[in-house]
């Protein structure tokens, strides 16, 4: 069922079938913003619990909560899409068909910084179709910096075009 979202004054019509990359980007930006809000509230409002995956990689309860939020929204909107997430499904070997739509997620990129109260962490979401990365979104909710890019169309910071340095 179609629905419309408005981001920075631009309306995007979101459909559950094959979508334009601009609509995928809009959806990913909405996800990143919601995930960023959860990152902030998890760190401000509760005691973070910690564990280690593979014995050495720090993972927090916030990593898992943000991962669950993003994954659930993608599955709800696109049940046929594959999700590759650092926290819940980190093994690329589990992705059998790279030609199908694929979401690549790092729910909290910079977990160590996040866990130690530093603001250098972000939500990272990418979308690939037919083996090619088409859309990338990175949000640092602490600095309100939302980076987004669409293959062949350049990159934006908070909706403004940016150039490679």
Give residue ranges: language-model regions.
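Conserved G/P- and acidic residue-centered "switch" motifs that form tight phosphate/ATP-binding loops
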Residues: 63, 111, 140
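Charged/polar positions on well-ordered alpha helices
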Residues: 30, 34-38, 112, 138, ...
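Short, flexible active-site-adjacent loop segments at beta-strand->alpha-helix junctions, enriched
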Residues: 89, 109-111, 143, 152-153
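Short loop/turn motifs at secondary-structure junctions and domain boundaries
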Residues: 94-98, 117-118, 139
